[in-house]
Amino acid sequence: MVSQDSCDKVTKKYAQLKLFSYFCVMKLAPVALFVYNRADNTRRTLEALARNTRARETELFVFSDGGKDEKSWKRVHEVRSTVKEFVEAFRKLELVERPENFYLERNITEGIAEVFRTHDRIIVLEDDILTSPYYLQYMNEAFELYNEEPRVMHVAGFTNLALPDVPFYFTPHMSGWGWGTWRDRWNGHFRHYTSREEALDGLTAADLDRIQYGGVFRCLQSLDKRPIPWDICWEIAIYRAGGLCLTPGQTMVRNIGLRQGTHFRSWSLLQRYEFDREPSQQPLPLTRIENPEKDEAVEARFAQAITDWGIRYTPLGKMLRFIYNGKHIK
């Protein structure tokens, strides 16, 4: 008679071999990179992406927005020349040159739609996002593991938390820096709203309170911008659908362009320390969780993190927290 221990070992070995085969043959998502007029940032973004372990197996679509005037067109051409230097770094590089200035929101939403005509999942980067060498591996594993779980609508590359004991977690809050989604989730739920009234139609005061984490996360202020940013539209879409965002416990991306970005305001620089951390240099272990739910403990930490301007990552912030709280908070 075969012992239970022997059966367990065979079962474990079979599961390991099945998982190995699963990820060796998995379908890799294309990357859509959106660029405008920052050649230096674009180069750094592409260099980091090219260092990814799955870069040479990955299709890259670069959507280059057009200029607004003669000066900006000159910088746009510099960006396009920079992109062409990386044609050998990926399985395929397709450069889409916009003939006019689409602006960020239109360039992104139309670019995503173009990729989804031929692919069922997408990884989205902008021209100021440095990725971990294991970023593409992480994103594609997440796509494979949760492809059949429609509640998981978004895969994030960034977290403003640092959770060394939590490889990944689920939250209704999306991060738009180095993210990805599936065609059925995006096409089924995303709407690019044109007014605050349209965006919030049917939502209650309690809904708005939950979206804004009790008022500390004032994301709905973005609804007063014109055009309305795509990311707040997606945030609301995920909330309306009861969706979740798979998010890493350690950030897999770093934003290097806030000082120059389209939506950046100089007065908010002091709030951006947390966004300028080095991405993880280690693979992120992912597993399939049945019936995923948001982690209430992590949600509480996120709500707290929003209020401290990210200075907990600076030496001064850590010292102040040690003095006032009697312990370090990562």
List where the protein language model places each region.
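Leucine-biased recognition of intrinsically disordered, low-complexity hydrophobic segments
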Residues: L17-L19
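An acidic/histidine-cluster motif and surrounding catalytic segment
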Residues: M26-V124, I129-K330
